[in-house]
Amino acid sequence: MLVTMELPDWVGIKTERGFMTGPFRPDGDYGREILLETENSENRTDIFLTAGEEAVEWLIFRWKQSFSRDSRFLGDAWERGYGEMEWRCLNANRAMPWYFMAWNPDALLCYGVMTNPSAMCFWEADAEGMTLYMDVRCGGAGVRLRGRRLHAASVIARKYADCSAFEGAKAFCAEMCPSPIFPDGPVYGGNNWYYAYGKSSHDEFLRDTDYLVTLTKGCRNPPYMVLDDGWQVLADNPDAPPEGGGGPWYAGNRLFPDMAKLAGEVAARGARPGIWIRPLKDDVSPFSPEWRLPHTNCLDPSHPEALKHIVSNIQTVCAWGYRLVKYDFVTFDLFGKWGFEMTPSVAAKGWHFYDRSMTSAEVVKRLYQAIYETAEPFQAMLIGCNAIGHLGAGYFHINRVGDDISGKEWERTRKMGVNSLAFRLCQHNTFYHADADCVGITGAIPWELNRQWADVVARTGTPLFVSIDRAVLNEGQQRELAAILEVASEQKRHAYPLDWMNNTCPCEWRDGEEILRYRWHTPVYPGFVRPIEWEVKQLPGG
């Protein structure tokens, strides 16, 4: 049901000259040529900022509000989850990006901003009220609107009773996102990263494709086979920058001599070709310094010519024949921070984008929209990775909702994968399709653990990608994986977590009438990060 959002009780405005604070003014006039207006409709409150020459950094709205003492709170994350998502008690110091939910035995209260705002927004809740912070900076400096009226955000509130917390959360996500885009069919298949880790070749990738096609034989929908990092020009060059992972992206290297031919051969084998790209990173091409961000040296999409170059690379890989494009590092390369480092500011001080008239959120949206408009004529599916989901909803079909899993350390898969799947599953089929990352099958992790991970992903109806060393699985394990891939190929299941209120790594899930119990913490394999390197061996008689 709708919850009427009253006008805020208190307003704060931070500019480069100082901080203004006081009671909310219905006329919106706060001096210094700053106009902060609200427009209320039946189901939302729109917030608009108009400013002259004053460089505005933050807008802060404060409401008086009380929450029952037994309430539990859940917020979102800036980009991917890092294993930290959970329902918690009231914590006034907890920044909750984009939205938050307050659950008690009687109802679920939800407050948030609609997707695609023009500010980086987060909430705080405390014993006396709730506060919405809207970061309207341009990078780490104030935005210079020069008379432009900025639609900063649209705030909505809902209350859900007579349903589970998960059902209410999913309904609220649907309310926040009026215009999502979804894949035109089930997306599942293979990705070569978590066993190859960038060491592959044209022929090796085709052998991976053949293996995947064999595992998915008889599936109604063909799988995608995604070529991850390692194909680009500098990936096989000893003179490349030491951190790697960057462009240029106009061609493959000597191990991938013909990228268009490779895409065609993957398709001829019965799989749909996909590819990974890091579109903002190219340390070696002689671009104008204006094209580059001062703190990361990556391309600045607020510069029109830099943006044209960025999307030209997207067009190139689509023209080669790749029908799924996974574009990565698009938050780190812009802001120089991982999501867990944004505590709570997305951008550090001391820099700004080329176009000072745009907020950071507007720059991010411009990038996502340009990539979408470039890929759309090719009917290519887009996966955003290290992307800001609340800004990308409607611009990419799939979002990587958690940090990387591992083909070597089970603890990383358990922490990043299971947690992100459980706590962002409410965004699946509401914002986009939620991708909790791959299943890394290298032999370093017991099959029983990876089997469970693959099983729960398939049963949720979210995209399942497997990354397989072809020499690892025996015939029985291959049959088990083939059965799981068949479930993933249809995406008719919609399992969801049951014990997520009390467990950051939910073990109990409901799939229709079936209650599933997964054993993520098993004595077969240490459930912790090893503090030193040692070899895990089976003890005699164990």
How should each PLM-predicted stretch be described?
Residues 135-137, 146-153, 191, 357-542:
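Active-site-proximal substrate-binding groove within the catalytic cores of carbohydrate-active enzymes
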Residues 49-53, 99-107, 209-216, 263-267, ...:
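Hydrophobic, Leu/Ile/Phe/Ala-enriched alpha-helical segments that form helix-helix packing faces
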Residues 162, 198-206, 253-256, 361, ...:
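Generic detection of long, well-ordered alpha-helical segments
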Residues 88, 99, 221-443, 449, ...:
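Aromatic- and carboxylate-enriched substrate-binding clefts and catalytic-loop regions
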Residues 186, 245, 455:
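Residues that flank catalytic or metal-binding motifs in active/ligand-binding sites
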Residues 43, 184, 221, 268-270, ...:
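Short, well-ordered loop/turn elements at secondary-structure boundaries
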Residues 1-224, 324:
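Carbohydrate-recognition beta-sandwich/jelly-roll modules
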